[in-house]
Each structure stands twice: as structure tokens, then as C-alpha cells.
Amino acid sequence: MKPFTFYEAIEANKRKTWIIIFVISILLFLVCYAIVSYFELGEFGILVAFLMVFFVNYYAYKNSDEIILKYSGVREPTKEEFPYLLNVVEGLSIAAGIPTPKIYVMDDPSPNAFATGKDPKSGVVVVTKGLLDLLDRLELEGVIAHEISHIKNYDVRLQTVAAVMVGLIVILGDSLKRSFYYSRRRRDKDENILGIVSLVIAILAPFLATLLKFALSRQREYMADANAAMLTRYPEGLASALEKISKNFQPVKRANTMTAPLYIVNPLKGGMSNLFSTHPPIEDRIRRLRMMGERWKLLDKEG
């Protein structure tokens, strides 16, 4: 496989991201349509379904930051405590063309970091004490650039909306399955093609949507890696940081399944198969970053 540029990696991941979001949206529509058709709710039912989707998304969008920070148990560092951290975040924010995000530290020995914020104006970068103790400045720059890329690319907003959509698909699909099995109308619909199709949608849509949510999370990690490499012009910094984090891994105590996709590496115990993982394999991320570095060196020699 030939080395690829930052721009090629970013564009490829953008395309994959929007394909995934489109397919999740189609699955949500299919589940809503199956419910409306099965219960013969008509136009009113469709309106109620879409209003529910809108309000749940809006609530998640407005409150996600506060909920995440509250559950993570973070604190604001002082300038005297970590002066280099504040300098790195400020410098990379200027380079990325976004307002300097708020910085928080989590007193946890596990080396990890995450970003949150609905948009660049409300961006937040959180790093663990373990990360600050482990990495040198160039490696820390790679990690911070990765998190700033998440903020610049509106990844938290995207992940929140996707998570809510998938959650709705799972809830609605489960409700439809229960109704199919226990409704008084079941006898009348056993041989009905619409009833069978609705049941198939109720079973498959939640499973497929969950897989797509994980795939979306992995694509955004690849994209943030590529953006970080472009921002620092030094892919090896992030590659080396990921290598160290992998070798010194331990679970983050305050992490949970809700916040896990936000971290630079999976903060929870145990690994999962690629299809069900929120993060790409670290080895693959390191390999891609070093391939970008090789391509950059070749372009420098040619130019």
C-alpha cells in the first residue's frame, strides 16, 4: 500500500462519515415508517415520530457537554501546575483557527484524553494526569492536536446526534417487536406481509444502526489523527504517543459507555472485535500515521 497524504485521508473519511450518517437516517425512517404502518397511525403518527426525534436530539445537543464533564470528575488546572499544557493548547488552537478551548485535568493515572463541545466556541479538552506524566512535549502536541481536530470538525455534535438516532432506533425497534408478539391484533397480522416486514425491520435495524454508530466513531478517530498530523506537521508525535499509551494502558476509573467514544483510546476494560469497537486498532492508527510521515518526506524531497 502506497503512503497517502493528509488530505487524501481526510477526504476519504469525510465521505465515509456522511455515508454512515445517511444510512443511519434511512434506518430511523424505516423503523418509524414500520411503526406507523403497522399501527395504521397515518399522517398524525408520522408527525409525532418526527417531533419526538427532533426534541430528543435537541435535548441531547443542548446538554451533552455538562453531562459528560459532570460524570468525568474533571478540574481546572492552574498555570503554575501545568504551564506547558496551557501553552500547547493555545498554540495549536491558533494554528487550527479556533478559539482556545477550556482545559480540564482528570486526576487519573491512566494516560488518556478527550474533547467535548457542541462547536469550537464551547470546546473543552480534558487530559488525564497519567497522560501528562507519560508524554514528552512533541507527543503531547500530537494528542492535543487530535482533540482540537475533534472540536474543529464538530465531532461531538455529530456523535451525539448519531447516538441519539441509534438509541431511538433501538427503543422503537424493541417496542415494535413487543407489539408484534403481544398485540391483540397479532392473529390478524400473522400472515400479513406488512407485519412480517415490520418485524424484520424491528430486528435488523437496531443491530445495523449500532454497528454503523461504532463505524462512525472509528472513522472520526482516523480523521482526527490525519488532521492532527496536518496541524503539527509531525505525524510521529501522535504515533509515538499512541504507542506509549498502548503500552501503559489501564482503564479510566470515571469512564463509561456513554463517554468512551470521546477518548483518544478506548478507556474501558477489555478489547472488542473491530465491528463492535468504538476505536480503530491502535496498531493500524500508528501504521497510518507513519505512512503519512513517509509520504510527507517523499514530497519534501521531490519539492
UniProtKB/Swiss-Prot annotation:
Belongs to the peptidase M48B family. It comes from the Bacteria. Its EC number is 3.4.24.-. Keywords: Cell inner membrane, Cell membrane, Hydrolase, Membrane, Metal-binding, Metalloprotease, Protease, Transmembrane, Transmembrane helix, Zinc. It comes from Dictyoglomus thermophilum (strain ATCC 35947 / DSM 3960 / H-6-12). It is found in: Cell inner membrane. One of its GO terms (biological process) is proteolysis. Disulfide bonds: none annotated. This is Protease HtpX homolog. The active site is at E147. Its cofactor is Zn(2+). GO terms for molecular function: metalloendopeptidase activity; zinc ion binding. Binds 1 zinc ion per subunit. One of its GO terms (cellular component) is plasma membrane. It holds the Pfam family Peptidase_M48. It is a multi-pass membrane protein. Zn(2+) binds at H146, H150, E221. The chain crosses the membrane at residues 19-39, 41-61, 156-176, 192-212.
